[in-house]
């Protein structure tokens, strides 16, 4: 029997939470009810989901998708997020690929750590996932005298209409996932 439970696959031995079940049910309903997404969603599933509070009495839904399926999710990202935001009544939906950070190898060991498993690569990948479909066109790091570090991320101005209202959501979600302060902006376009 094909049920919503097949839409979520957790690590061995872990049961999905109640909220994860509702997200899996939403995926299942979209697959069965929405004709344009049906064929695309057939083989896709999620690893987990978390709901978080945002400043200003808003909520965001972070959905973790398998790293290997991220390209398939990116093909339907805009339509899928629009439908999920309707289902979750205005909550901002963010899709993030599940990535692992591996500790650096000990001195003298012959083990080589893949570049994709380093802390920097994982945090950069999460940042790209959070702001998708907009592309990052520039980064600046600002160091305060007290040691704080704030990253300023410039997004592609072509996606301004789709992403401008979500910039606060992006920075809150990234701070929750990576613990880094981030400010999103669009580069100034010169009019000649």
Curated annotation (Swiss-Prot):
Offer a single GO CC term for the protein.
small-subunit processome
InterPro entries registered for this protein in UniProt:
Ribosomal_eS7, Ribosomal_eS7_CS
Q: Which GO terms describe its biological process?
A: ribosomal small subunit biogenesis; rRNA processing; translation
Carries keyword Ribosomal protein? yes
Q: Which UniProt keywords apply?
A: Ribonucleoprotein, Ribosomal protein
What residue stretch is flagged as signal peptide? none
Taxonomically, the superkingdom here is Eukaryota
Any GO MF annotation of the entry: structural constituent of ribosome
Q: Which PANTHER family match?
A: 40S RIBOSOMAL PROTEIN S7, SMALL RIBOSOMAL SUBUNIT PROTEIN ES7
Q: Which family does it belong to?
A: Belongs to the eukaryotic ribosomal protein eS7 family.
Q: Can you name this protein? A: Small ribosomal subunit protein eS7
Its source organism is Oryza sativa subsp. japonica (Rice)
Mind giving the lineage of the organism this protein is from?
Eukaryota, Viridiplantae, Streptophyta, Embryophyta, Tracheophyta
């Amino acid at each position: 029997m094909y049920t919503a439970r097949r839409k979520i696959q957790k690590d061995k031995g872990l049961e999905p939470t109640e909220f994860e079940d509702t997200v899996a049910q939403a995926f299942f309903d979209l697959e069965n009810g929405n004709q344009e997404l049906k064929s695309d969603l057939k083989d896709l599933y999620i690893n987990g989901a978390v709901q978080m509070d945002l400043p200003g009495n808003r909520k965001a839904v972070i959905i973790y998708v398998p790293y290997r399926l991220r390209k398939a999710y990116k093909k339907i990202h805009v339509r899928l997020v629009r439908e999920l935001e309707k289902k979750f009544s205005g909550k901002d939906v963010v899709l993030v690929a599940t990535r692992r950070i591996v500790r650096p190898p000990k001195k003298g060991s012959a083990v080589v750590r893949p570049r994709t498993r380093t802390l920097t690569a994982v945090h950069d990948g999460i940042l790209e996932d959070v702001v998708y479909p907009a592309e990052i066109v520039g980064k600046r790091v600002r160091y305060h005298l007290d040691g704080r570090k704030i990253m300023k991320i410039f997004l592609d101005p072509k996606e301004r209409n789709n992403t401008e209202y979500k910039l606060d959501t992006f920075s809150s979600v990234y701070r929750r996932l990576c613990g880094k302060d981030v400010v999103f902006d669009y580069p100034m376009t010169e009019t000649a």
